[in-house]
Amino acid sequence: MEAAASVFDERGYEAATIADILTRAGVTKGALYFHFSSKQDLARGVLDEQFAEGGVPPRQSKLQELVDTSMVMAHRMQRDPMLSAGARLSLGPDMREIFGGGSVPGWIKVTEEMLIQAKARGELLPHVNTAETAWTLSACWTGVQIYSQTLVNREDIEHRVSVLFEHVYPSIATPAVLARLEMGRTRGAEVVAEMRRLEAAEVVGDQVAS
């Protein structure tokens, strides 16, 4: 799957071939087709992986959790071909017809669910429409990553996503909540480090229990 993601990320869906993927993966055609029936099936697997990664640690503030999710994605986008390929597959020509919009509908849904929870907790200003805000925020995030990729090969994506939230959140978050939110450009790296510490502690706990 990682080999397929790398090829899709570098060449796009149409230009990528099964031969390219086989060469990159170092496996036989039979081994590949045992798991995936076609190039389209492989691409769907890459798209499904967008939501397979464990989520960020739960936060008292759902708006913080949404920032953390987005900043972790920005951090990993530069380092994980699976995420980068998923973005390219979702936004390429004719991808709506082939994949139904790729991961875009899923991310809009994830964003809206967090905003609904934030509203229930009193974190949002009264005028905020969660569905419209989720669509707009997701579209803005996508635009930021496309511009960052086009202009500087995503070298500034974490800074740009941070700036996005600094511009959007004052119009939707209550002042008390806004004052407590952490939205700096290093937030993604900090949360990833936190997740690794939690995973390591869980492994140690399992070993002790066994």
Where are these regions (language model features)?
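Short alpha-helical scaffolding segments that buttress acidic/His motifs in well-ordered protein cores
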Residues: 85-90, 137, 141, 168
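Solvent-exposed, amphipathic alpha-helical segments
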Residues: 3-10, 53, 136, 140-147
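C-terminal peripheral helix-coil segments that are non-catalytic and often amphipathic
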Residues: 64, 68, 72, 76, ...
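Short secondary-structure transition hinges
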Residues: 73-127
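Helix-turn-helix
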Residues: 3, 7-41, 45, 49
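Hydrophobic alpha-helical connector segments
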Residues: 45, 53-83, 134
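Hydrophobic recognition helices of helix-based DNA-binding modules
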Residues: 46, 50, 54, 141-148, ...
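Hydrophobic alpha-helical bundle segments that form small-molecule/ligand-binding pockets
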Residues: 107-134, 140, 147-152, 172
